[in-house]
Structures are given as structure tokens and as C-alpha cells.
Amino acid sequence: MGESKQEHLIVGVSPFNPRFTPEWLSSAFQWGAERFNTVDVLHPGEISMSLLTSTGTPLGRAKRKVRQQCNRDMRNVEHALEISGIKLGRGKPVLISDYLQTQSYQCRRRSVIAEFQNNQIFQDACRAMSRAACQSRLRVTNVNIEPDIETAVKYIFDELPAYTHCSDLFEYETAALGYPTEWPIGKLIESGLTSLERDPNSSFIVIDFEKELIDD
């Protein structure tokens, strides 16, 4: 896939994650440019607020912190582009929150929620992943509370349509969403244990600078 350079790489960036430094992003952009026609960036934007509110941050403060973090991440992306000399295919990062209210995205999000309500395996996986994310956040903030998992899972509801239909979101014929680690919910979808499916024109890869491209 990457060797033919016929597809587009979309680098997923997570807020509040120290991995996504300008140096790491620069390496990811260069890595992608060697394997794909274009490189782009996908960022959650304001939907990451649910992670903060589910771990005790008041709504008003959560909004401010998310805006600040998003701006910080965008500066890191710009710095990484300067270091690498790469230009994004879409010209600028794409924020999931900018597309959340579109008809197609809302339709796919409703499908995710319906799966959560009707599939115990999917529900358990979403809750487990959300709890792990909350616990990681609580360790960073040194707060000892029980996280609100029902709020936290909304982050997955908001993100998943971008995972399953990244090519459509970016208006590319084909595209691969790249991230430095596997995504457990994505692996569950690929297992066939849910009714959710990934668009055949969209794929997921693990970005690993030391190994060959890993494609699931």
C-alpha cells in the first residue's frame, strides 16, 4: 500500500498526549511522505472536552483547557511542518469537531451509539477503553475521583466515524489513518463482532519508524 504511493496518510493526533511533540510529528510526516502521495493531520478538536469533564474538570474550565491544548497542538504541527519541509495535502489540520454536526457524520455517530446500546461486547470494550483513558488523565492531574464513564464514552462516539470513514472525511478516494499504537475499538470492529464496518476505501496503520509499515 505505502510502496505504491497511491494513497493518502492521515496522521491522528491526540490532545493531552506528550508523544505528539514537533520532533515526533516531523518524523511522522517524513515517514509518511516517503510512502504516500500526501500527508494530512486529524485532530479531535473540542470533542476531547468529554475526557476532561468525565474526570472532574468543570465545563467552563474544560472548554478553556481544550481550546488551549488544541492551539498548542496546532503550533506543534506547524513547527513539525517547518522542520520536515512537508506540506499537508489539505493545507491545514482537520478537526473532527468541525464535522460533528454534518448529516453524514451524525448518521454514522448514531450507528455507533446504537451499537453501544445493543451490543454488550462493544459496550464493554468502549467502557474499558474510556476507563483507561480517564485513569491516565487522573494520574496526570493527581486527582482521586471515580470517573464518569458514561460521559467519557462520548469521546469514542465522536471519534469512531472518522476512523471508519477517514477517506470520506478528507474527500480522498482512498486514505489510511495512522497512529503510533493500535486502537482497541478499531481491532474489535475488524474482528467482525460488531455490525459496524470500516469503509473499504479507508484503512488504519500503525506508524512505526523502526519497523516496516504495519497494516491491519
From Swiss-Prot:
Its EC number is 2.3.2.22. InterPro entries: CDPS, CDPS_sf. It holds the Pfam family CDPS. The record marks 65, 75, 155 as: Could be involved in aa-tRNA binding. Keywords: Transferase. It is an enzyme of class 2 (transferase). The active site is at 14 (nucleophile). The record marks 17, 159 as: Could have a critical role in the catalytic mechanism. GO terms for molecular function: aminoacyltransferase activity. The keyword Glycoprotein does not apply. It catalyses: 2 L-leucyl-tRNA(Leu) = cyclo(L-leucyl-L-leucyl) + 2 tRNA(Leu) + 2 H(+). Substrate binds at residues 17, 155-159, 179. This is Cyclo(L-leucyl-L-leucyl) synthase. It comes from Corynebacterium jeikeium (strain K411).
